[in-house]
A protein has these predicted regions:
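Active-site-proximal beta-strand/loop segments in catalytic clefts of secreted hydrolases
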Residues: 153-154, 189-190, 238, 267-268, ...
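Acidic, contiguous N-terminal accessory segments
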Residues: 2-230, 417, 436, 446-458, ...
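Active-site neighborhood of glycoside hydrolase catalytic domains
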Residues: 351-471, 477-484
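Loop/turn elements at helix/coil->beta-strand transitions in domains of secreted/extracellular proteins
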Residues: 258-263, 309-313, 383-387, 441-448, ...
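Flexible, acidic glycine-rich loops studded with aromatic residues
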Residues: 447-628
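Feature activates predominantly on carbohydrate-active enzymes
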Residues: 163-369, 374-387, 554-557
Length: 628
């Protein structure tokens, strides 16, 4: 027994001694990279270097200055001039020296946007860790170097909310003096929104240099930039599964990093009604998944403001007359009659596209009174609004045709049970709810958005829907139908959301049976990037339709999404959408790959759990991960 204990003690002593030596070695080892990078033919090439710290040329330095656009995302549309030199500085020496704007409210927004910008820069600085970082750069030299930012918004740029006609253009200049002691940044924009985008571009001209242990900024830059499309959106469904406010904030952070400007908030559906309304508390009481899974008024107001200072509008969708069910159970007990029909009806595939079923009872006049209250409160808590999404998706006519109250209503009006009769009834409903929706105090009459449907078909659209009142969001596959071309030819403004490229929930398997999801395979970032709205329009109409084609929107239905998977399913594919809609490049995805991979790194650095696209090795060894 004694010998056994001696052996154990010897082993333990050896382990402790080895650990002590290892700790001592790690404490003394500089952990500097043995590699440097050089820019060769617009590619950062990895090389071995000696131990001389003066030879260090870090990957971040190379990526900032290599190639015409460095690591800017989305790529600017007009002019990009980036020098091949950087200067180092301390974050405390980065300041907003001047913010010229026509009103105090715009100045306040500029200050908030600058604070967000500076916070994003700070996220790029790693936490101090003596095991891995040594203080290399001369702190006195850093303290002397200053970065001054001046922002000028034109006298006409009083807008503080985004509209379809808002000018989002900007001009950005970075100039460093001969002694590298002062870098002046000037931003000129017509509106706050353009200035905010310029700050995002500026943040992408700054990187942490691990070789120097310091922040660095490109010394000389000129950028002239404006978006190709007015509407650049993401649909977030928070009704199929509840998404927390914090997760929505991360989504908005990522959108801002990519200059996307519209969050389409699909906030209610048949499955749940998580929106608390003061005038109708029973809606969320009966319709939410739990008391903790509700968006109250302050939550909504917070999201709207959080989005606004990041250059994003929030467009709420109240889906009707389809996708309505939970939340409406109380109306019969209150003597208002049944307002939702076919709710949870079986077999569900007969009455709706997916379970649970449910549609509004458009034969019950009390329905309009409740809808008026819903619209008035939504208009208030989401204010200011210039756009409102009325839904109109996947209305099942068989549901109405098997509802006695609706069939009797048709008979009383002398109508039969034909498809045209139901479409007449549906279009009458749509006209009524549009007229009921209150005007906004700032923007006036709100323009409606509808999904493409039987009402928007080539034979019916101009009969039922006034193109001056409605924008049509076109889903479905462009390969299977000419919906977009037909709508454009009839003079409708269109938002493209074709399912064969921009439905990001596809490819994860069916959630009602085994096998593939009904919307097909996974849409990789390359397919998202290559989906050009102008090409779609040109193929179907012979024209790019620049006035009518407002832009596009990636869609994430959340039947298989919650907080845990949201970021990875949206990002970085949402970034591919962003460059398509901001820049609308003539080339395909391949020339964008290096910048795209870096943008994914940037999103992760900022706290967005964006999915991995390639091994880290590919990020460090550009253009070597390919298949020919």
């Amino acid at each position: 027994m004694a010998d056994s204990r001696d052996v154990k003690n010897q082993i333990l002593f050896s382990l402790l001694f080895t650990a002590s030596l290892l700790h001592s070695a790690l404490s003394d080892f500089p952990f500097l990279s043995p590699y440097s990078w050089s820019c060769v033919n617009e590619t950062c090439v990895k090389n071995l270097k000696g131990w001389n710290e003066e030879d260090a040329y870090s990957l971040s330095t190379c990526k900032l200055t290599c190639g015409q656009h460095g690591v800017l995302w989305p790529k600017p549309t007009r002019l990009t001039q980036i020098s091949n030199q950087t200067v180092h500085f301390n974050l405390s020496r980065l300041s907003l020296e001047e913010a010229m704007a026509p009103t105090q409210e715009v100045k306040d927004l500029l200050q908030k946007a600058f604070d967000i910008f500076k916070g994003n820069v700070a996220k790029g600085v790693p936490e101090p860790d003596e095991r891995f970082f040594r203080k290399i750069f001369d702190s006195d030299e850093q303290e002397k170097q200053q970065v001054f930012v001046k922002i000028r918004v034109s006298n006409t740029g009083k807008a503080t909310t985004l509209r379809l006609n808002t000018n989002e253009a900007y001009v950005l200049n970075v100039k460093t003096n001969e002694t590298n002691s002062l870098t002046n940044v000037t931003i000129d924009a017509s509106t706050f929104f353009g200035a905010r985008h310029a700050l995002e571009t500026l943040s992408q001209l700054i990187e942490y240099d691990a070789a120097k242990g310091s922040l660095q900024i490109v010394s000389q830059v000129a950028v002239v930039d404006k978006p190709a499309f007015r509407y650049r959106g993401i649909l977030l469904d928070t009704a199929s599964n509840f998404i927390s406010v914090r997760a929505i904030e991360r989504t908005l952070d990522a959108m801002a990093a990519n200059k996307l400007n519209t969050l389409h908030w699909h906030i209610t559906d048949t499955a749940s009604f998580p929106l608390y309304l003061k005038s109708l508390p029973d809606m969320s009481y009966f319709g939410s998944y739990s008391q903790r899974q509700i968006y109250n008024t302050s939550d909504v107001s917070h999201v709207v403001e959080y989005a606004r200072v990041r250059g994003i509008r929030v467009v709420p969708e109240f889906s009707a007359p389809g996708h309505v069910g939970n939340g409406w159970q109380w109306t019969e007990k209150k003597g208002l009659g049944k307002m939702a029909v076919c709710v949870k009806q079986e077999p569900w595939s007969t009455y709706c596209t997916e379970p649970p079923c449910g549609q509004l009872n458009i034969a019950n006049n009390n329905t309009y009174g409740i809808l008026t209250q819903i619209y008035e409160e939504m208009a208030d808590i989401f204010a200011p609004l210039d756009l409102f999404h009325f839904g109109g998706q996947e209305v099942n006519l068989n549901c109405w045709n098997t509802t006695e109250e609706i069939v009797s209503h048709l008979t009383e009006r002398g109508l039969n049970q034909s498809v045209d009769s139901f479409l007449d009834l549906w279009s009458e409903f749509q006209s009524n709810v549009y007229n009921m929706f209150p005007a906004d105090n700032q923007t006036g009459k709100v323009q409606g958005i509808l999904w493409n449907s039987q009402l928007t078909s080539a034979e019916k659209a101009d009969k039922y829907l006034d193109p001056r009142k409605y924008i049509i969001q076109a889903s479905g596959s462009v390969k299977d139908q000419r919906v977009i071309g037909d709508l454009l030819k009839k003079g409708y403004h269109v938002i493209l959301s074709n399912s064969d490229a921009w439905f990001l929930n596809c490819g994860f398997g069916s959630w009602v049976t085994k096998g593939q999801h009904p919307c097909g395979s996974y849409k990789g970032w390359q397919a998202v990037y290559d989906n050009s709205p102008h090409d779609v329009a040109s193929n179907e109409t012979g024209s790019y339709q620049k006035k009518l084609l407002l832009g596009g929107e990636a869609v994430l239905w959340s039947q298989q999404v919650d907080d845990a998977s949201l970021d990875a399913k949206l990002w970085p594919r949402g970034a591919a959408l962003a460059e398509r809609l901001w820049t609308n490049p003539k080339h395909n995805w391949e020339p964008a790959e290096i910048r795209f991979i870096h943008q994914r790194q940037r999103l992760f650095q900022r706290g967005v759990m964006a999915d991995r696209i390639q091994p880290e090795w590919c990020h460090q060894n550009e253009k070597l991960c390919y298949l020919r």
